[in-house]
C-alpha cells in the first residue's frame, strides 16, 4: 500500500467516522506500544535530517491528550464524551500526517536512516508515548494509530459502545491484516472478525460512530467472499479454493444464526449448483447484500 492509499483509509474513517492506515521494511509488524510508565522518550534526534523535527512537533501533545481525557471524564459514558474523543482523534490524525511526512522525507534523503537500530528504537518510543506506532508496509514508514493507547487514555471515560469498539480494534491491530494485497490472517479468523462486527452492531444499535464499525464489517465480509488480489477465493482453474470452501462450511456450521453465515450458506448453495465456480447468480446475490469486490482494491494493512 502506498502512502496515498494509506492516508486515504485514515481520512475515510475520520470523515465518515472510521480508521487510518499510512505506510518501513516490507512485512515488518509492529509490536504493541509500551505502557506509558515504561517510556523514556528522547528529547531530540541528531540524524541531520527531517526526523530531527519530530520531537518538536510532538512537544506539548501529551498535554493536549490529557486535557481531552479530562474533558471526556467530565461527561463520562455519554455521547458527549465520545464526541470529545473523536474531535481529539481528528487532531491526532493530522499530527500523524505531519510525522509521516517527515518519515517520508527522511527516507528519501537518507535511505538507511531507519535501519539504525538505536534511531528506530528511540523513534518508536517517542511516537508510542503519544499514541502512534511506527509501522511499515511495502518498504515505507508511517505513523499509525495505536488503538490500545486510546483504551488506556480514555479508560472509563467513553460510552460502553466506544470502549468496546476500541478494544476490538486494538486486538485486531495486533495482527497484521494484509500486506501487498495478500491476506495475513487465516480465512477462519477473517470470518470470525466479520461475525464479531455483526454482533457488535446488534449489541450497540445506537453507536455514534456506526460508519467506522460498518467499514470494518464490510471490509472483512467483502474480503471473505471476494478475496484480495494476492489471496484469491477462486483458483487459477476457476474453482473455489479448498481452504476457502472449508472455511465457508465451518462458518455456516459454527454461527448458523448470524446474517453473515446465512449469506455464506446461500453462496455455497449457488456455488455447488455451478461446480464451485463463480456465476452471475452469485454476483447478483452479493450485489443485493452490498458486498463489493476487494479485487483491485488496496485493503487496510492492520
Which sequence ranges carry the predicted segments?
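Amphipathic alpha-helices of TPR/Sel1-like and other helical repeat/solenoid scaffolds
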Residues: 190-203, 244-251
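N-terminal Sec/ER secretory leader and immediately downstream segment
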Residues: 32-146
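Sec-dependent bacterial lipoprotein signal peptides
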Residues: 1-13
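Bacterial signal peptide processing site
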Residues: 16-19
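Short coil/turn linking the two alpha-helices of tandem helical-hairpin repeats
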Residues: 97-100, 111-114, 121, 131-134, ...
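Soluble non-cytosolic domains of exported or imported proteins
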Residues: 180-191, 204-211, 238-242, 258
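A cross-kingdom marker for long, charged
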Residues: 222-223, 234-302
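Short solvent-exposed coil/turn linkers within tandem alpha-helical repeat scaffolds
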Residues: 152-160, 200-212, 251-262
Amino acid at each position: 500500500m502506498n502512502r496515498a492509499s494509506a492516508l486515504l483509509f485514515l481520512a475515510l474513517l475520520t470523515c465518515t467516522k472510521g480508521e487510518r492506515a499510512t505506510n518501513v521494511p516490507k512485512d515488518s509488524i509492529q509490536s504493541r506500544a509500551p505502557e506509558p510508565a515504561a517510556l523514556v522518550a528522547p528529547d531530540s534526534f541528531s540524524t541531520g535530517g527531517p526526523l530531527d523535527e519530530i520531537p518538536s512537533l510532538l512537544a506539548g501533545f501529551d498535554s493536549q491528550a490529557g486535557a481531552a481525557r479530562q474533558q471526556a471524564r467530565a461527561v463520562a459514558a455519554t455521547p458527549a464524551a465520545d464526541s470529545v474523543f473523536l474531535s481529539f482523534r481528528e487532531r491526532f490524525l493530522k499530527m500523524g500526517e505531519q510525522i509521516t511526512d517527515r518519515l517520508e522525507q527522511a527516507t528519501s534523503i537518507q535511505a538507511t536512516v531507519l535501519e539504525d537500530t538505536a534511531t528506530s528504537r528511540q523513534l518508536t518510543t517517542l511516537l508510542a508515548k503519544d499514541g502512534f506506532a511506527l509501522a511499515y508496509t511495502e518498504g515505507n514508514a508511517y505513523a499509525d494509530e495505536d488503538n490500545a493507547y486510546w483504551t488506556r487514555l480514555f479508560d472509563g471515560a467513553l460510552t460502553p459502545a466506544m470502549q468496546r469498539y476500541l478494544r476490538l480494534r486494538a486486538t485486531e491491530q495486533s495482527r497484521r491484516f494484509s500486506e501487498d494485497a495478500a491476506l495475513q490472517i487465516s480465512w477462519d479468523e477473517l470470518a470470525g472478525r466479520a461475525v464479531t462486527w455483526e454482533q457488535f452492531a446488534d449489541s450497540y444499535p445506537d453507536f455514534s460512530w456506526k460508519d467506522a464499525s460498518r467499514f470494518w464489517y464490510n471490509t472483512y465480509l467483502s474480503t471473505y467472499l471476494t478475496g484480495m488480489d494476492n489471496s484469491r477465493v477462486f483458483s487459477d482453474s476457476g474453482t473455489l479454493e479448498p481452504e476457502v470452501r472449508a472455511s465457508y462450511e465451518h462458518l455456516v456450521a459454527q454461527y448458523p444464526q448470524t446474517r453473515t453465515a446465512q449469506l455464506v450458506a446461500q453462496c455455497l448453495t449457488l456455488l455447488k449448483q455451478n461446480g464451485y465456480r463463480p456465476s452471475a447468480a452469485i454476483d447478483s446475490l452479493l450485489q443485493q447484500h452490498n458486498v463489493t469486490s476487494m479485487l483491485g482494491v488496496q485493503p487496510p494493512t492492520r
